[in-house]
């Protein structure tokens, strides 16, 4: 059984992942990390990652860039691989992700959906053809007014592809 720490457990994606894992007999969320324990999870929730002394095989992160530095330090110190899905990371944080990945496995993705990852591949292929034909490429995105990171991690990933 894969034991998971859900970092950002009370957010939308944290709850989606919690629901999926709950139905999987081969995985279990053994702890959650979030700024508050809202009492809606079947596992213990810690408001300080350093207080989490639970044994785990992996950390899945859907929190925010504000929590990334401490998460990376924790992951490296405890040698727990991390799936990093937070967006809006600074250049310094991206460098820290790179450095941490030399000590422990880090999978970083701006968007985990199959649709977006298929789109990233299609954009790579289209860019090769269109750029050589003289086309200019532009990304335009629209979000609700409460969007935390703009441009979004997905838009940045599309631009990088």
Put a short name on every predicted segment:
Residues 29, 45, 82-83, 106-108:
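Hydrophobic beta-strand scaffold residues
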Residues 40-50:
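Active-site regions of enzymes building and remodeling cell-envelope glycoconjugates
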């Amino acid at each position: 059984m894969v034991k998971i720490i859900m970092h950002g457990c009370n957010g939308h994606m944290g709850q989606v992942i919690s629901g999926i894992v709950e139905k999987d007999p081969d995985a279990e969320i053994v702890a959650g990390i979030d700024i508050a324990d809202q009492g809606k999870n079947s596992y213990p929730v810690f408001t300080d990652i350093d207080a989490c002394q639970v044994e785990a095989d992996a950390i899945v992160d859907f929190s925010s860039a504000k929590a990334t530095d401490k998460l990376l330090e924790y992951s490296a110190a405890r040698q727990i691989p991390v799936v990093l899905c937070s967006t809006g990371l600074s250049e310094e944080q991206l460098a820290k992700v790179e450095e941490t990945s030399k000590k422990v496995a880090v999978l970083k993705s701006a968007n985990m959906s199959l649709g977006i990852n298929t789109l990233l591949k299609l954009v790579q292929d289209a860019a090769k053809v269109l750029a050589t034909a003289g086309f200019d490429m532009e990304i335009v995105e629209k979000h609700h007014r409460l969007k935390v990171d703009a441009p979004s991690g997905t838009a940045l990933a599309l631009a990088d592809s």
